[in-house]
Each structure stands twice: as structure tokens, then as C-alpha cells.
């Protein structure tokens, strides 16, 4: 691994470690999403705590945290494996942020941003899958997990060389949803609205 590759991975992790949910809630005078609502610093919890505007800002910032470092890797002509590692680093930063005591979100929006540079067709498939499942079931967590599980298949159909890193990222997202899975099967998982 080259020094530049290592620097790109570190930058991706540090960028991912900026918790937009916590910062936006502070700026808007909302409760800390790590200790309120579902206690997850992500767009869905911020939606419940502060409405569409705050959640939209969190969603945008979280997508950009994943997108910018991967686009940087594309610009520097990194190979697919390195781009995957950069994407995973950004998501790990979001999930386990250095700046916020390693208590982060689930990484769904950051992963969407990290996968967006692969292509708009993949982004559309992922976003469309999430929306359809939310509209049918009302569960953001179920939509996120189902979309994560389908992401490697969609990637294989669009650009197969990225399938392995996307599969690794998908595993991280599903594992991060372990509490949601438990609540869902216990009948205690909350719907998005």
C-alpha cells in the first residue's frame, strides 16, 4: 500500500467521524440523537426528533461524507479494491467516530454516498429499493437492511469489479443493525412515521 493510499483511507475515516446528526442537532437546539429517540445519530432519528429539515441536512452531510473521499480516489485513479477500502473507512468513521466517543450511526446514508460514484444507475437502484420498502412496510431499518443485502447483487449487475468491497460494506451495515433486528422480531421496532 502506498503512502497516498494510506492517507486517503485515514482522511476517509476522519471525514466519516464527523457526526452531522450530533452537530446539526446542537445547532438547531434539538436533543442529542445519541441519547434521545432511538439513540442512533442518523437521519431517521433526527427526523423523529426535529423534522424534515434537520433530517434532510443530516442525510445530505452523511451522503457527502461517503461520496467525497471515494470521488477523490476515483480522481486519483485508485483501483476498485482501494476505492472499496476508502468507502469502508468512511463508513467505519460514521459508525465508530473518533470525535464522538466511537458512538455513531448505522452508516446507511454514508454507504449510499460512497457507492454513488460507481454510477447513477446503482444509486437509483439502491435508493429506489429503500423507498419502496419504506413505503410498503414503514420500517426504515428493514429497508436499510434489505437494500444493504441487495447492494452486492445490484453492484454485480452494474459494475462487477466492485462487488467484493460492496459486499463487505453491506455486511458491516447489517451487523450494525443487530439491535433493530432484535426489536423487529420482538415486535418493538418503530416505524419511520
From Swiss-Prot:
Lineage per the UniProt record: Bacteria, Pseudomonadati, Pseudomonadota, Gammaproteobacteria, Vibrionales
Class of this enzyme: transferase
Cellular component per GO, a single term: plasma membrane
TM spans (from-to): 4-24, 56-76, 80-100, 116-136, 152-174
Biological process, per Gene Ontology: phospholipid biosynthetic process
Function: Catalyzes the transfer of an acyl group from acyl-phosphate (acyl-PO(4)) to glycerol-3-phosphate (G3P) to form lysophosphatidic acid (LPA). This enzyme utilizes acyl-phosphate as fatty acyl donor, but not acyl-CoA or acyl-ACP.
Tagged with keyword Transcription: no
Enzyme Commission code: 2.3.1.275
UniProt xrefs under InterPro entries: G3P_acylTferase_PlsY
Compartment(s) of residence: Cell inner membrane
Stated name of the protein: Glycerol-3-phosphate acyltransferase
SMART domains per the UniProt record, alphabetical: G3P_acyltransf (SM01207)
Source organism superkingdom: Bacteria
Entries under PANTHER family matching the protein: GLYCEROL-3-PHOSPHATE ACYLTRANSFERASE-RELATED, INNER MEMBRANE PROTEIN YGIH
Keywords: Cell inner membrane, Cell membrane, Lipid biosynthesis, Lipid metabolism, Membrane, Phospholipid biosynthesis, Phospholipid metabolism, Transferase, Transmembrane, Transmembrane helix
Amino acid at each position: 500500500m502506498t503512502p497516498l493510499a494510506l492517507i486517503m483511507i485515514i482522511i476517509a475515516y476522519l471525514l466519516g467521524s464527523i457526526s452531522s446528526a450530533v452537530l446539526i442537532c446542537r445547532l438547531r437546539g434539538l436533543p442529542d440523537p445519541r441519547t434521545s429517540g432511538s439513540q442512533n445519530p442518523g437521519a431517521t432519528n433526527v427526523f423523529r426528533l426535529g423534522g424534515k429539515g434537520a433530517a434532510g441536512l443530516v442525510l445530505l452531510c452523511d451522503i457527502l461524507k461517503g461520496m467525497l473521499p471515494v470521488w477523490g480516489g476515483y480522481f486519483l485513479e485508485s483501483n476498485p479494491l482501494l476505492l472499496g477500502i476508502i468507502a469502508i473507512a468512511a463508513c467505519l468513521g460514521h459508525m465508530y467516530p473518533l470525535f464522538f466517543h466511537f458512538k455513531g450511526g448505522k452508516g446507511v446514508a454514508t454507504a449510499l454516498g460512497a457507492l454513488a460514484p460507481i454510477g447513477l444507475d446503482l444509486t437509483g437502484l439502491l435508493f429506489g429499493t429503500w423507498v419502496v420498502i419504506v413505503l410498503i412496510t414503514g420500517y426504515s431499518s428493514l429497508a436499510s437492511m434489505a437494500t444493504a443485502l441487495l447492494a452486492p447483487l445490484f453492484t454485480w449487475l452494474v459494475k462487477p469489479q466492485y462487488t467484493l468491497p460492496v459486499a463487505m460494506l453491506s455486511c458491516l451495515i447489517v451487523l450494525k443493525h443487530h439491535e433493530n433486528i432484535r426489536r423487529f422480531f420482538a415486535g418493538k421496532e418503530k416505524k419511520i412515521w
